[in-house]
Amino acid sequence: MTHINSALEDADPNIASLIQEESKRQENHLELIASENFTSKAVMEAQGSVLTNKYAEGLPNKRYYGGCEHIDKIEGLAIERAKQLFKAEWANVQPHSGAQANFSVFLSLLEPGEKIMGMDLSHGGHLTHGSPVNVSGKWFKAIHYGVDKETQRLEMENVREIALKNRPKLIICGYSAYPRNIDFLAFRSIADEVGAYLLADMAHIAGLVATGIHPSPIPHCDVVTTTTHKTLRGPRGGLILCRNAEFGKRFDKAVFPGSQGGPLEHVIAAKAVAFGEALKPGFSSYCEQLVKNSKALAKRMQDRGIAVVSNGTDNHIVLLDLRSIDMTGKEADSLVSAINVTTNKNTVPFDPKSPFVTSGLRLGTAALTTRGFDEPAFLEVADLIADRLLNPTDLILKNKCQQRVLDLCNRFPLYD
């Protein structure tokens, strides 16, 4: 029994040491991966609590296990806060991830072999929106739409034509590398015209939707899924929302027992904490600054001669088109990684390179904005990235860029 009272550094010094090393990496690197953010200590405290010990299959007050009286209250708070935050009538907070949330929707609304329609992965879509390597592309007949070749933005008339030609059962809007606002009302009109369900996957923009900076999909879509991290700043997890409570109930059974067993109640508690944080006024200020930072970053990259997909951004994503400097995403990712800037290579629309090489580099402002970075700081970030990419063989400049990164990290510390 004594093992349960041992501190991690005593029970498993190897893991404790690696966690400490990762903590140092996060503190001393510039985190620009668009799907990552930093949670509060309160969120981490909830997730690392005794709630991890409890099994709670079912829904609040409808459990298959006893001893859930406190769990029910915690999950109930998470549900009510999610509904309040997004102005939804129904919510399920149990999905372990955004992918699980999407799969639960498919399980509820579709039969194998039916048609789904989502954005092409290389244009900014997501694996779970019909990619052939994902179950969504294996079980369903996937049709894809993309952006205009010139503007690199969605042209809704083109989306409409593809929908009319293919008559999908489900249309998906919401993306992983699309830096512009989404016209949910236009998607609703198209879905109605072809008799399709409409799913919005707002995983990347949930924080912006919650604060009204991005238009909400809730009034226009049959169902909405999201992750709870990214711009929402919560723990890694998923969430399903509906404007209609009766319609939403069908997804409860799709989550459990349809696609999951016991919910992760320690993560659900952390979600509740994050939703509570997002309901406070300071979160709106954070999201407003996040977008300002993105626009500043995009403009400075363009000023330095590096093209930006769609010629700018409306959200936290800045997607660089490195064909403008004759460089691949793989090369660029390696170059900035060497100065402790964390990004990811990414395809750009109509990319001639493979997904393992790519012509793009995806940047995101969510994590550094959490650290307190403002527009002047992001101009510094843009300049050191541009300096590195435009002078890849200059080792003296590389060392200077490394020091500039460390100076920025010291000016904007992560955790006390």
From Swiss-Prot:
PROSITE patterns: SHMT (PS00096). Its main location: cytoplasm. It comes from the Bacteria. One of its GO terms (cellular component) is cytosol. The keyword Cell inner membrane does not apply. The record marks 229 as: Plays an important role in substrate specificity. GO terms for molecular function: glycine hydroxymethyltransferase activity; pyridoxal phosphate binding. Keywords: Amino-acid biosynthesis, Cytoplasm, One-carbon metabolism, Pyridoxal phosphate, Transferase. InterPro entries: PyrdxlP-dep_Trfase (IPR015424), PyrdxlP-dep_Trfase_major (IPR015421), PyrdxlP-dep_Trfase_small (IPR015422), Ser_HO-MeTrfase (IPR001085), Ser_HO-MeTrfase-like (IPR049943), Ser_HO-MeTrfase_PLP_BS (IPR019798), SHMT-like_dom (IPR039429). It is found in: Cytoplasm. This is Serine hydroxymethyltransferase. It comes from Prochlorococcus marinus (strain MIT 9211).
